[in-house]
From Swiss-Prot:
Source organism per UniProt: Danio rerio
Protein name as annotated: Protein Hook homolog 1
Disulfide bonds: none
UniProt cross-references to SUPFAM superfamilies, sorted A to Z: Hook domain
Function: May function to promote vesicle trafficking and/or fusion.
Any one biological process term the GO annotation gives: lysosome organization
């Protein structure tokens, strides 16, 4: 039997593949999800198995047993409703499939029952002819199994079994009535077909009769017209007699056919009466079948009531046993309630302690955060102070350089003033000599220079060489100035980088000292606490601090290497760097001494605070001391900023003075050039003078103009 059911399941799976659903339906595991079956039902009757119902079927269920079970339940419920409401057939006589076995065990027997119900829906819907034709195209073995399943469904839908003995006669009567009904329906179809044929023959004969009657009328007319036709001796009479004989034969045949038609009509009426009787009998049998179904439903209800009564009796027995055990459970319940009360008190006390610990931890975290922020601010302010100190040193060096330049310019100004006075005196003497007529051009005293005795070519070459020497000297001075500025910029960059690295180095040393202090504190805590449960946390914290310490040391080593790389090659810069290193070492020693004093004062403050109130947080004293240091640093920074601003103002004033001096010198130089050009244009200089004499003549031309004018007026 199980083999037949498995063959039935496999054949029905092959039949289900003809629907060409989107979901796979090749194996039993593919069908356990229910997606392929729901899509096939939607193709069978889209009006009942609608799109909304199809959307409720989950497709991606995977191995989820619950989702598969829900899908199969929805499909089975919809099929049963389809049989009851659309096909008007009760499914009480058909064993419904066990869906749990289908989902969990992939049972082919139960799956075959479900597929058999789907097959019944297909062969009983509006498109049953199409699906029957599809079944006929399958293989013979599959077709035979599918037809057997259809016959089983058809046999089960006829009548339902009532019980044991009285149901046998009714079943036989129903089977016999169904056989008679099928025979009568077949005979009815044959008689209807025969009636159609006879009707066609009657119509043909009536047409022939009408045509013959028309011919008969024509012949009677002709017979009336031609009385000679009555004479049989004439050929027309013989023809008339023959036609009359044929007419009589046709009339007899017509009468015979009408009699046969009447006989067939009577026989058809009798068959219709028999069909009406059989329909009444079929209605009676269907009413009996409905009564049998209702009786079977009542029998099933009574059986379920009896089963329920048995279950209730068993449950009553179990409840009695449970009531017997209830007293023990109550005693245990009381004991558990007492334990629960004790546990509740313990939990309340522990929660209070935990709340206090959390509050203390939060306060400690805030203090730690404040300390870290203050450390960060201190490092930033110290870096800023170092930068300001470096800027101040730079400004001081610039100031010293400007003071030296000012002294040099003042010395040069004094020398120029002296030369100017000498030139004025000589000019005054020359003017007096010219006025007195004692100073004549071309005299031996005027040509007292050795250069004037040289030829003109040598003088021109000498002048050109002097000009080239001057230009080369100017180019060399410009290149030396550019080189000096580049070296000064490199020195400033090196100093700035060194100061930055020094500040970073100092901050890293401070951080290392703090980390070492924290490591020592943690080691002391580990030694004091011994085997407490939070040793792992302290060890992790110690390891983290050690890692930070190693990183800080590595960073210091890298910055030391950078400092070594930034050592200048020039001797002057090396000397200055040595001086700066000495000053830096001195500052480092001062900083170490200050740090030692700070640590000593900090330890003393901690001891005092602990001695006063051990419950207070030790971080508050550190915070206060750091705040004091920050305020001192702020004051120092403000003072340095003021000094820096004053130095900038002094530098700006010195720059203004220098620019005014340079502008004045440029104006004097322009005036001299203009006087030279005007002198050459007027050709006032005699051709026999030397270059220096020409220069003196050009420079003194303007001054002599003011003296010559009043002299000429007096003459």
């Amino acid at each position: 039997m199980d083999l037949k059911k498995t063959v039935l399941c496999e054949s029905l799976i092959i039949w289900l593949q003809t629907f060409k659903t989107a979901a796979p339906c090749k194996t039993v595991e593919d069908l356990t999800s229910g997606a392929a079956m729901s899509q096939a039902l939607h193709q069978i009757d889209p009006s009942w198995f609608s799109e909304s119902w199809l959307a409720r079927i989950k497709e991606d269920v995977g191995d989820n047993v619950r989702l598969k079970m829900n899908n199969l339940k929805k499909i089975l419920q919809m099929i049963v409703d389809y049989y009851n409401e659309v096909l008007a057939q009760q499914m009480s006589d058909f064993p419904l499939p066990d869906l749990m076995r289908v989902v969990e065990q992939s049972d082919q027997v139960e799956l075959g029952r479900l597929l058999q119900l789907i097959l019944g829906c297909a062969v009983k819907c509006d498109r049953k002819q199409e699906y029957i034709q599809i079944i006929m195209t399958l293989e013979e073995s599959v077709q035979h199994v599918v037809m057997t399943a259809i016959q089983e469904l058809m046999s089960r839908e006829s009548v339902s079994q009532l019980g044991a003995e009285p149901a046998g006669d009714t079943e036989q009567q129903l089977k016999k009535a169904l056989e008679d009904l099928t025979e009568v329906m077949a005979e009815k179809e044959e008689l209807a077909q025969r009636c159609q044929e006879l009707d066609m023959q009657v119509t043909v004969l009536q047409e022939e009769r009408n045509s013959l009657l028309a011919e008969n009328d024509l012949l009677t007319d002709r017979s009336s017209q031609l009385e000679t036709f009555d004479d049989p001796s004439t050929p027309s009479g013989r023809k008339h007699s023959q036609l009359q004989f044929q007419l009589e034969q046709l009339q007899e045949e017509n009468f015979r056919l009408e009699a046969a038609k009447d006989d067939y009509r009577i026989h058809c009426e009798e068959l219709e009466k028999q069909l009406v009787e059989l329909q009444h009998r079929n209605d009676e049998l269907t009413s009996l079948a409905e009564e049998s179904r209702s009786l079977k439903d009542e029998l099933d209800i009574l059986r379920s009531c009896s089963d329920r009564a048995v279950k209730l009796e068993a449950s009553v027995e179990t409840y009695r046993k449970k009531l017997e055990d209830l007293s023990d459970l109550r005693r245990q319940m009381k004991a558990l309630e007492e334990k629960n009360m004790t546990y509740m008190h313990n939990t309340v006390s522990l929660e209070e302690e935990l709340r206090k610990a959390n509050a203390a931890r939060a306060q400690l975290e805030t203090y730690k955060r404040q300390v870290q922020e203050l450390h960060k601010k201190l490092s930033d302010e110290s870096r800023r102070a170092d930068n300001l100190v470096f800027e101040m040193k730079k400004l001081q060096e610039k100031y010293d350089a400007l003071v030296k330049e000012r002294e040099r310019i003042s010395i040069e100004r004094d020398t120029l003033r002296e030369t100017n006075e000498e030139l004025r005196c000589t000019q005054a003497q020359q003017d007096q000599l010219l006025l007195a007529g004692k100073y004549q051009t071309g005299s031996p005293s005027h040509d007292n220079l050795a250069a004037e005795m040289l030829p003109i070519e040598y003088r021109e070459k000498f002048i050109r060489l002097q000009h080239e020497n001057k230009m080369l000297r100017l180019q060399q001075e410009e290149s030396e100035k550019q080189r000096i500025t580049e070296l000064q910029q490199q020195l400033e960059e090196a100093r700035r980088g060194r100061s930055q690295l020094d500040t970073d180095n100092r901050l890293n040393r401070e951080r290392i000292s703090e980390l070492q202090q924290q490591v020592e504190d943690l080691q002391k805590a580990l030694q004091t606490q011994g085997a407490k449960p939070d040793d792992s946390h302290l060890k992790r914290k110690l390891d983290a601090h050690m890692v930070q310490l190693n990183e800080a040391q590595d960073e210091i080593m890298k910055k030391k290497e950078l400092l070594e790389d930034l050592q200048p090659d020039a001797t002057q810069t090396s000397v200055k760097m040595d001086e700066l290193m000495a000053a830096l070492k001195k500052k480092d020693e001062d900083m170490r001494a200050m740090e030692d004093r700070y640590k000593m004062y900090l330890e003393k403050a901690r001891d005092v605070i602990r001695a006063l109130d051990p419950k207070l947080n030790p971080a508050s004293a550190e915070i206060q001391s750091l705040k004091v240091q920050l305020s001192d640093k702020d004051k120092k920074i403000i003072a340095l900023e003021r000094e820096c601003e004053q130095a900038k103002l002094r530098e700006y004033e010195e720059k203004l003075i220098v620019t005014a001096w340079y502008n004045k010198s440029l104006n004097f130089q322009k005036m001299a050039i203009e006087s030279r050009l005007s002198g050459r244009a007027n050709s006032l200089v005699p051709p026999g003078q030397s270059f220096l004499a020409q220069q003196r003549q050009v420079t003194n031309a303007r001054r002599t103009m003011s003296i010559n004018v009043p002299a000429s007026s007096s003459k």
